[in-house]
């Protein structure tokens, strides 16, 4: 009776999704450096049966990034990820570009390391996430904690992100045992 008419436990199935990667940064856009982030995302999402159906490389121009996000949504992408431009440098304009799409920003910033500069938002129900650089370098990050929920269409709230503060420090163990460790578990 404590739960009322609601079930005590509700299991949401994860579903393979079509996703977009919007790579940002003048260094990649102008060909000075290779995009090494996208292949990592493709690999991580392939583990869940997801397919990248849209990819665009943008300069550090908020209008161009905004347009690419909107184009990805129009192309039917069910998840949209941006890479680059998520820090606090003056030319890091990706959070502004996401906001300019009209997306509802849930949070920009999280009490999780690695992953403090993570942004999650929803554009007409489609998750748009700004991924910090750590997702490319660290074995496990906030992205790994939240991806299963995104694939299960489980809406992420600011309260959910705040709760990650307890257990939100990955210890970077020499041999990773995640998810069988304290990272992401409170």
Q: Model features per residue range: what roles?
A:
Residues 26, 36, 50-182:
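Short glycine/threonine-rich loop/turn motifs
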Residues 1-53:
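Short, glycine/charged-enriched hinge/interface segments at domain edges or termini
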Residues 184-186:
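C-terminal and late-domain segments of enzyme folds
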């Amino acid at each position: 009776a404590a739960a009322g008419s609601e079930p005590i436990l509700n299991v949401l199935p994860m579903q393979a999704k079509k996703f977009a990667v919007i790579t940002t940064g003048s260094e990649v856009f102008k060909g000075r450096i290779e995009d090494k982030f996208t292949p990592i995302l493709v690999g991580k999402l392939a583990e869940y049966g997801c397919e990248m159906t849209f990819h665009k490389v943008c300069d550090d121009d908020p209008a161009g990034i905004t347009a690419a996000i909107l184009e990805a949504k129009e192309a039917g992408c069910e998840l949209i990820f941006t890479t680059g431009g998520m820090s606090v440098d003056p030319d890091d304009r990706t959070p502004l570009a996401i906001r300019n799409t009209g997306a509802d920003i849930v949070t920009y910033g999280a009490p999780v390391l690695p992953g403090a500069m993570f942004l999650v938002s929803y554009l007409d129900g489609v998750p748009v996430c700004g991924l910090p650089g750590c997702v490319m370098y660290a074995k496990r990050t906030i992205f790994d904690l939240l991806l299963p929920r995104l694939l299960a269409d489980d809406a992420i709230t600011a309260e959910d992100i705040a709760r990650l503060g307890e257990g939100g420090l990955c210890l970077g163990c020499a041999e990773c045992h995640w998810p069988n460790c304290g990272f992401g578990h409170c």
